[in-house]
Amino acid sequence: MNLNSIPAFQDNYIWVLSNNEGRCLIVDPGEAAPVLNAIKEKNWQPEAIFLTHHHHDHVGGVKELLQHFPHVVVYGPAETQDKGTTRVVKDGDSALVLGHEFSIFATPGHTLGHICYFSHPYLFCGDTLFSGGCGRLFEGTASQMYQSLKKISALPDDTLICCAHEYTLANMKFALSILPHDSFINEYYRKVNELRAKNQITLPVILKNERKNNIFLRTEDPDLINEINKETKLQQPEERFAWLRSKKDSF
């Protein structure tokens, strides 16, 4: 299997998973033009589309793509029914695409109906987890997002996190504002800074590393607890997550 990223809009990535025969899966096509260009260049044959949630920058290209490839099956949560979805899926469902079975699990927080798709090692997580960060809470609660991130963090160490935005540098600047002396965060910030200076993608990332570099996955870490306690005393990791998310919103 070959993993490809297609830049879209200002900072989106549309992920495409293709096999050696050229059949492919497209994830969260927010616009059609860059996908159609890549299909022509690579001679891909689209088989399916995965949608993680209903926001326009993830679904805006679906209907145009279906005009070109009407046979394609579009998987998505109920909140995407009017966006071109032809097969509504929910937590606990699975999808057989390109000969691989993808498990589907609910990750509410960014939106209430947000879902993720996982077939080892690939995780298509939309706007739930970013490298160094997590999605804004547009519809769900901090508690819901915390539980969603716990689900992702429990996946195998070598899981490839294929998230939908190039937010890594900004996320790591925020992380440094919270844990300025953390060796993992400083090292990763330097690496990300170098990549972005060359306009190179920072994704996908390996979950094992993300657990070290992403403060939103470290709410039980003693160093982070000590830093948060300098400003406020919070007993539960879920409360610490909510505090971090609120700080990031105004960073």
UniProtKB/Swiss-Prot annotation:
Keywords of the record: Hydrolase, Metal-binding, Zinc
Single biological process term from Gene Ontology: methylglyoxal catabolic process to D-lactate via S-lactoyl-glutathione
E.C. code: 3.1.2.6
Record's catalysed reaction(s): an S-(2-hydroxyacyl)glutathione + H2O = a 2-hydroxy carboxylate + glutathione + H(+)
EC class (word): hydrolase
Source organism, top-level taxon: Bacteria
GO molecular-function term, one example from the UniProt record: hydroxyacylglutathione hydrolase activity
InterPro entries: Clx_II_MBL, Glyoxalase_II_hydrolase, HAGH_C, Hydroxyacylglutathione_Hdrlase, Metallo-B-lactamas, RibonucZ/Hydroxyglut_hydro
Residues where Zn(2+) 1 binds: H53, H55, H110, D127
Residues involved in Zn(2+) 2 binding: D57, H58, D127, H165
Pathway annotation from the record: Secondary metabolite metabolism; methylglyoxal degradation; (R)-lactate from methylglyoxal: step 2/2
Listed Pfam families: HAGH_C (PF16123), Lactamase_B (PF00753)
Cofactor remark from the record: Binds 2 Zn(2+) ions per subunit.
Cofactor(s) required for function per UniProt: Zn(2+)
Gene3D superfamilies: Ribonuclease Z/Hydroxyacylglutathione hydrolase-like
Function (record text): Thiolesterase that catalyzes the hydrolysis of S-D-lactoyl-glutathione to form glutathione and D-lactic acid.
Family (UniProt): Belongs to the metallo-beta-lactamase superfamily. Glyoxalase II family.
Subunit annotation: Monomer.
Name recorded for this polypeptide: Hydroxyacylglutathione hydrolase
Lineage start: Bacteria, Pseudomonadati, Pseudomonadota, Gammaproteobacteria, Enterobacterales
